């Protein structure tokens, strides 16, 4: 069963945790590809100096200011696509970066890291940016709560963001082999063991 738009219309940090264990599905050219989400990062509001929204509704990040439940796909380093899901209330820019997945079906190659996840599921900015996640081509399927403990750490590659870089808004399923980076300073998320 597909996640409803209401799932995304909540605090981005809650959505980031609650996406863990759900299944990201992309149907492209008659092929279904899917991966279980095992790592996410939350980007919360215009004051979050690690967020693309810190510069306002630019051509790239304007989608973050829109309705929840939409894909925000962008290109980094000129080669890798990254997928976020827009969250929260319209007008308050927030999104969850999907950092890594565990292959479920039809994945083309590695799903460790946001660029690899998009490559494995054939998710591309030119086709999928702005796509409604309540549609039939790109969506997240509900799944039973994960058995693994949810852990948190600082986000990756955001040292430029000052104190915002230290926020523990990167979430993962503890011990999952598909988490994209070495754990570093992981800590358990209170009340989130399922």
Curated annotation (Swiss-Prot):
The UniProt family comment states: Belongs to the DNA glycosylase MPG family.
Q: Which NCBIfam families match?
A: 3mg (TIGR00567)
According to its UniProt entry, the protein's GO biological process terms are: base-excision repair
Native organism taxonomy:
Bacteria, Pseudomonadati, Myxococcota, Myxococcia, Myxococcales
Q: Which CDD domains match?
A: AAG (cd00540)
InterPro entries assigned? Formyl_transferase-like_C_sf, MPG, MPG_sf
What keywords is this UniProt entry annotated with? DNA damage, DNA repair, Hydrolase
Q: What class of enzyme is it?
A: hydrolase
One GO MF term on file is: alkylbase DNA N-glycosylase activity
List the HAMAP family hit by this protein, alphabetically: 3MGH
Q: Does the keyword DNA damage apply?
A: yes
State its Enzyme Commission number(s).
3.2.2.-
Name assigned to this protein: Putative 3-methyladenine DNA glycosylase
């Amino acid at each position: 069963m597909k996640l409803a738009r209401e799932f995304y219309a909540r605090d981005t940090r809650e959505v980031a945790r609650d996406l863990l264990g759900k299944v990201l599905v992309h149907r492209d050219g008659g092929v279904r590809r899917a991966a279980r989400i095992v790592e996410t990062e939350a980007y919360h509001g215009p004051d979050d100096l690690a967020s693309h929204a810190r510069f306002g509704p630019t051509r790239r990040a304007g989608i973050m200011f829109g309705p929840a439940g939409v894909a925000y796909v962008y290109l980094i380093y000129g080669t890798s696509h990254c997928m976020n899901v827009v969250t929260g209330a319209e007008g308050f820019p927030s999104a969850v970066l999907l950092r890594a997945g565990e292959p479920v079906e039809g994945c083309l190659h590695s799903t460790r890291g946001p660029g690899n996840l998009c490559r494995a599921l054939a998710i591309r900015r030119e086709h999928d940016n702005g796509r409604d996640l309540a549609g039939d081509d790109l969506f997240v399927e509900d799944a039973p709560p994960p058995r693994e403990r949810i852990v948190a750490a600082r986000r990756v590659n955001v040292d430029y963001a000052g104190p915002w870089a230290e926020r523990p808004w990167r979430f993962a399923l503890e011990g999952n082999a598909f988490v994209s980076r070495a754990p570093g300073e992981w800590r358990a998320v209170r009340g989130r063991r399922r």
